[in-house]
Structure formats: structure tokens, C-alpha cells
Amino acid sequence: MKKSLVLKASVAVATLVPMLSFAAEGDDPAKAAFNSLQASATEYIGYAWAMVVVIVGATIGIKLFKKFTSKAS
């Protein structure tokens, strides 16, 4: 009885240890997905800042144009 219990425990440990090390060393698909999402978000933020500069510049230009045309009239 005691030998079979020791044998079963050693078999269980022998099967669990390689599985745990394989799980720890493998690539995590969720981590890869979040890294890809972060890269895309960073790219889109860069595009957004370019649009902010264009919109603010156009708004200031329109206001200055209105100001100078009203003074010229």
C-alpha cells in the first residue's frame, strides 16, 4: 500500500513538473495581443496629435482672418 502511494505521488509529480515548466516558458498569446494593441494605440495617438495641430492652426488662422477683415472694412 505504501509503495503504491509513493509510486502514484512520484508519477503525479513527474507529470506536473514538465507541464508547469512548459507553461512558464511558453509565449503568452494574451500578452502578445495586448502588446499589439498598445502599439496600435500609440500609432493612433500620433495620428491624433497631428490632427490636433492642424485643427488648432486652422482655427487660429480663421479667427485672425476674421479679425483682419473686420478691421479692414
Swiss-Prot record:
Signal peptide as annotated in the record: 1-23
InterPro entries referenced in this protein's UniProt entry, alphabetically: G8P, Phage_M13_G8P_capsid_dom_sf
Topology class, membrane: Single-pass type I membrane protein
Cytoplasmic topology ranges: 69-73
Pfam families: Phage_coatGP8
Principal place of residence: virion
Entry annotated with the keyword Calcium: no
Purpose: Self assembles to form a helical capsid wrapping up the viral genomic DNA. The capsid displays a filamentous structure with a length of 760-1950 nm and a width of 6-8 nm. The virion assembly and budding take place at the host inner membrane.
Assembly: Homomultimerizes. There are about 2,700 copies of this protein in the phage capsid.
Similarity comment: family membership: Belongs to the inovirus capsid protein family.
Name this polypeptide is given: Capsid protein G8P
Source organism phylogeny: Viruses, Monodnaviria, Loebvirae, Hofneiviricota, Faserviricetes
Record gene name: VIII
